From Swiss-Prot:
Residues 101-293 form the Rab-GAP TBC domain. TBC1D3 is encoded by a collection of very similar paralogs with multiple copies of each paralog, some human genomes encoding well over 50 copies depending on ethnic origin of the donor. Ubiquitinated by a CUL7-based E3 ligase, which leads to proteasomal degradation. Palmitoylation is required for membrane localization and protects TBC1D3 from ubiquitination. GO terms for molecular function: GTPase activator activity. A lipid is attached at residues 318, 325 (S-palmitoyl cysteine). The keyword Ligase does not apply. It comes from the Eukaryota. InterPro entries: Rab-GAP-TBC_dom (IPR000195), Rab-GAP_TBC_sf (IPR035969), Rab_GAP_TBC_domain (IPR050302). This is TBC1 domain family member 3H.
Length: 549
């Protein structure tokens, strides 16, 4: 028996042992428990959400009692909406009531209707059982699933007992989904999402709710868990654009400390929504997210940055992920109604400015998300498709000078990021632009200045910050040899002084090393790489490009 067979048999035995523990029930040796324990067994240690506390809960405050009475009065309104769903499913009244709060005993049926789980069950009869059995036999992530289940909502009465009924149902859902969607397979966040569904839905309904949540374009949640998801990049770019517009100082500090590239606030936000705040606020935010869709993510992120503006400006590069998570958790450590009130106001503001969703990708981009185009250092971040036009060149580079080199045919080309092409030789002519070759008429006709609006269109999807490129490999692959001003002025001067041109051509080379030093330094400077985007033969007057590129 070779090593592969031994490893395969060991994994199979490990998988069977884990499944057997869940099949036996609570504590993997006691008789199988029939469900969650009743409320009276916890001696008034359970709140209205099902969270078990270590000490006995104090009596209800006036605010909590008012909230319970309010939920009871709202129940009849939600029942009426469910009875006439075709009328209310796209109405403003549904959104208004979702922000005010969804009653707990209505949340399960409402989630099922929003995610259309009944239709999925009718279209796929018996498929969940098949996927579940296949997952038990061939799961590759069962150890990770078992480890994550042990830490999922353990303070809730449904998931308090190890290997209990709800933990077994959660295992079945995750195994079935791993088999159902191999592209996503299993991720850590799926355990918390499925556990939230199990609080209010049966096992099979919770499975199809998870399927619909990740598959629907309305919520775009699969991009956070799939390696091929392109929507998440568009949401991340839009989030950076929104935060840079509303909180420029905060975003400027994040860029200065290079924190945005190390941790994604949007990805952190998804984890916070799953298992980082109080369960009551988590459920209310999920209610809004299921009703509004992906456009609710931008307002939530904007509120988090706005509330934590002072703390985020003091965030250093040391441990940015932990600091970000702590700041976001502190953001939601406040009254639920207050958070939802600010969320609704932010939602209306971003919708009015059309900043709640990223701009649609162009057809040639396919599924890839649009990248933001930096206008200038310290300015606004523009995205493709924005109504605002990108700014013009800075004043100190009013007009570039075309190279005076004779026309040459390109020998080879090398593709560069963003669609640009680097050519080994530098052709003078370009389509749509007159050739700037030296005029034969007179010395003054040797110069051809090109205005900015007549320049060839440069790639705008490059991730460039200022005159310097951040990525070393990209900078190495897109060197542009800049022609010095002396070389550009030499043909003009020779045209005006033909005698000096003949004298310099027949002059003997100097043997003095000191006299040749400036020319050698100049040649070395010309051969040295210069910064800037690949311009495909277009040479500027200076070796540094304007900060607006």
């Amino acid at each position: 028996m070779d090593v592969v067979e031994v490893a395969g048999s060991w994994w199979a035995q490990e998988r069977e042992d884990i499944i057997m523990k869940y099949e036996k029930g609570h504590r993997a040796g006691l008789p199988e428990d029939k469900g969650p324990k009743p409320f009276r067994s916890y001696n008034n240690n359970v709140d209205h959400l099902g969270i078990v506390h270590e000490t006995e809960l104090p009596p209800l405050t006036a605010r909590e009692a008012k909230q319970i009475r309010r939920e009871i009065s709202r129940k009849s309104k939600w029942v009426d909406m469910l009875g006439d769903w075709e009328k209310y499913k796209s109405s403003r009244k549904l959104i208004d009531r979702a922000y005010k709060g969804m009653p707990m005993n209505i949340r399960g049926p409402m989630w099922s209707v929003l995610l259309n789980t009944e239709e999925m069950k009718l279209k796929n009869p018996g498929r969940y059982q098949i996927m579940k059995e296949k997952g038990k036999r061939s799961s590759e992530h069962i150890q990770r699933i078992d480890r994550d289940i042990s830490g999922t909502l353990r303070k809730h009465m449904f998931f308090r007992d190890r290997y209990g009924t709800k933990q077994r149902e959660l295992l079945h859902i995750l195994l079935a989904y791993e088999e159902y969607n191999p592209e996503v397979g299993y991720c850590r966040d799926l355990s918390h999402i499925a556990a939230l569904f199990l609080l209010y839905l049966p096992e099979e309904d919770a499975f199809w709710a998870l399927v619909q949540l990740l598959a629907s374009e309305r919520h775009s949640l699969q991009g956070f868990h799939s390696p091929n998801g392109g929507t998440v990049q568009g949401l991340q770019d839009q989030q950076e654009h929104v935060v840079a517009t509303s909180q420029p100082k905060t975003m400027g500090h994040q860029d200065k400390k290079d924190l945005c590239g190390q941790c994604s606030p949007l990805g952190c936000l998804i984890r916070i929504l799953i298992d980082g705040i109080s369960l009551g606020l988590t459920l209310r935010l999920w209610d809004v997210y299921l009703v509004e869709g992906e456009q609710a993510l931008m307002p939530i992120t904007r509120i988090a940055f706005k509330v934590q503006q002072k703390r985020l400006t003091k965030t250093s590069r040391c441990g940015p992920w932990a600091r970000f998570c702590n700041r976001f958790v502190d953001t939601w450590a406040r009254d639920e109604d207050t958070v939802l009130k600010h969320l609704r106001a932010s939602m209306k503001k971003l919708t009015r400015k059309q900043g709640d969703l990223p701009p649609p990708a162009k057809p040639e981009q396919g599924s890839s998300a649009s990248r933001p185009v930096p206008a200038s250092r310290g300015g606004k971040t523009l995205c493709k498709g924005d109504r605002q036009a990108p700014p013009g060149p800075p004043a100190r580079f009013p007009r570039p000078i075309w190279s005076a080199s004779p026309p040459r045919a390109p020998r080879s080309s090398t593709p560069c990021p963003g669609g640009a092409v680097r050519e080994d030789t530098y052709p003078v002519g370009t389509q749509g632009v007159p050739s700037p070759a030296l005029a034969q008429g007179g010395p003054q006709g040797s110069w051809r200045f090109l205005q900015w609006n007549s320049m060839p269109r440069l790639p705008t999807d490059l991730d460039v910050e200022g005159p310097w490129f951040r990525h070393y490999d990209f900078r190495q692959s897109c060197w542009v040899r800049a022609i010095s001003q002396e070389d550009q002025l030499a043909p003009c001067w020779q045209a005006e002084h033909p005698a000096e041109r003949v004298r310099s051509a027949f002059a003997a080379p100097s043997t003095d090393s000191d006299q040749g030093t400036p020319f050698r330094a100049r040649d070395e400077q010309q051969c040295a790489p210069t910064s800037g985007p690949c311009l495909c033969g277009l040479h500027l007057e200076s070796s540094q490009f304007p900060p607006g590129f």
